[in-house]
């Protein structure tokens, strides 16, 4: 009971509650006095001579003042409470922002430390363990590969580029004499715009959603690589090996793919508009739903390719081989040229 009374008292101590209670007490007291005066004819109070209008005139001013005071205090209290809550929220937001900044800095430092440690250890393998002169079965190669595959997932997109360029410039991923096998390496979302990876061995690497626009990949080997949704716009992929690579939904607009090997590649939904695919090998490739508008496919091998739903409007198919390809006459009619092309039924277009 004592606890209940204390709780009640704490509540009425609030400014707006105190005003409201005071108002009620005053009104009740006046009502009781008036009622008693009328009932017992207290002439000395002068109550019996008062009319209802007299009482209204008498009570209206204190009631208005009391209600006005209550509303003022209530509004001020609400505004103060709102301001306090806003200050508290602002302080929480600022604290969270500082904490996030500190976390970002700490994470960035960890990534930089991991990168420098990797480069130092690879340099040690090159200088002291003769990594470059090692044979495929040598333990030093396995160590180099494990270190590479382990560090990449710990790095951000920019530092992945640093690792790849270090390997390329050190001659560790050159075609024909690759030392570090990047099959399965996590290079997803790596920022490799304008990177020079000429004749780099990237077979089986995970380059999904990587930024490779304007990259120099001429003669590189990307066979079986995951390039799903990668940005290869305007990249140089001339004579590049992309057989069985997954390039679905990728952006290869205006890319140079002349003489590239794309046999068995998955290019469903890819954007190849205005790309140079002249004399490229696209045999057995999946190009369903691909955008090949205004692409140069002159002399390209598209035999057994799946072109279902592909956009061939304005494409140059002169001299191309479409033998056994899945494509409709309506699609081919949108091409700008079919001169000397081998048609799906093995006939030659005039």
Give a label for each model feature.
Residues 1-350:
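Intrinsic low-complexity/IDR segments
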């Amino acid at each position: 009971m004592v606890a209940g009374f204390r709780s009640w008292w704490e509540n009425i101590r609030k400014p707006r509650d105190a005003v409201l209670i005071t108002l009620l007490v005053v009104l009740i007291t006046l009502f009781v006095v008036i009622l008693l005066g009328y009932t017992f004819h207290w002439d000395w109070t002068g109550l019996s001579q008062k009319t209802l209008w007299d009482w209204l005139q008498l009570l209206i001013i204190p009631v208005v003042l009391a209600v006005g005071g209550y509303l003022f205090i209530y509004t001020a209290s609400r505004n103060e409470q709102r301001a306090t809550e806003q200050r508290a929220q602002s302080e929480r937001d600022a604290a969270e922002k500082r904490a996030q900044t500190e976390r970002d800095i700490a994470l960035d430092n960890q990534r930089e430390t991991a990168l420098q440690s990797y480069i130092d250890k690879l340099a040690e393998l090159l200088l002291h363990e003769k990594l470059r002169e090692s044979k495929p079965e040598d333990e030093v190669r396995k160590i180099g590969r494990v270190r590479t595959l382990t560090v990449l997932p710990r790095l951000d997109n920019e530092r992945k580029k640093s690792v790849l360029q270090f390997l390329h410039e050190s001659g560790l991923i050159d075609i024909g004499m690759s030392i570090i096998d990047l099959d399965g390496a996590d290079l997803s979302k790596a920022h490799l715009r304008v990177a020079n990876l000429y004749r780099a061995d990237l077979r089986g690497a995970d380059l999904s959603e990587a930024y490779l626009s304007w990259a120099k990949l001429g003669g590189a080997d990307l066979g079986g690589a995951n390039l799903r949704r990668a940005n290869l716009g305007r990249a140089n992929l001339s004579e590049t090996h992309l057989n069985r690579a997954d390039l679905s939904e990728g952006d290869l607009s205006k890319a140079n793919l002349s003489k590239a090997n794309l046999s068995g590649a998955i290019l469903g939904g890819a954007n190849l508009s205005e790309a140079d695919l002249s004399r490229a090998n696209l045999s057995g490739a999946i190009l369903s739903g691909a955008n090949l508008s205004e692409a140069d496919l002159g002399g390209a091998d598209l035999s057994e390719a799946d072109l279902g739903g592909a956009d061939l409007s304005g494409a140059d198919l002169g001299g191309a081989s479409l033998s056994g390809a899945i494509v409709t006459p309506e699609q081919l009619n949108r091409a700008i040229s079919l001169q000397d092309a081998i048609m799906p039924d093995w006939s030659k277009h005039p």
